[in-house]
């Protein structure tokens, strides 16, 4: 029996990015494959006709490539951390229906998926927790969730498309709190500069009636700007379209590679990695 999704619900907001990951898998099979998204979309009762139509436009196809690269980059950093910390906690901040944690499973890490209660309720239906995996309800800005993470073997945290919706002060407070609680841990996430964040914000800020876009988190020079928050932070960044791959695949046009250069360059679309050093 298929899982029915109604229009204008929390469930609907969760399946749109899920559908994007399915489209990525079809358009760029050599670069990205999300078998869980492909399977889940098949198990869901929902009218995808509008999403299907939109997915074929030029900018939507480039948007799908962005999604694919972001997920690949974050997974690369998680796996890289697990090489030196095989028993680490792998923590997906604002998980939605993303299965990156599971796709990085090395057989000994512990996976935590964190999101709001209504999101986790849907996740428990569609993606119930497996071995060494927990779905945890929380508000990321309320640090009570720190106590639920077993970081005795290290901890790598990742957030995909999450911090654009946070105020700069919220991200700073969260990062400093994590540095206190998880020395030796690592946080990786995607970010962009102010111009890009304004473009991202155009749609959702209108509906939220928020006028001050400038208060929302954006970054151009991550090592300099975020590094200044706290002396314990070891900050680096790489372009998220071309920082991990050259995109020289038959499925990616020269025009899309040009757009990727613009994204990484002018828009500072990047993957930021923060290592939490010891107390100073």
Q: What are these model-derived regions, one by one?
A:
Residues 1-91, 95-138, 151-152:
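Rossmann-like AdoMet
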Residues 165-178:
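A short, conserved alpha-helix within the catalytic core of class I
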Residues 198-213:
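Short, glycine-/aromatic-enriched active-site segment of Class I SAM-dependent methyltransferases
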Residues 213-240:
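Short alpha-helix
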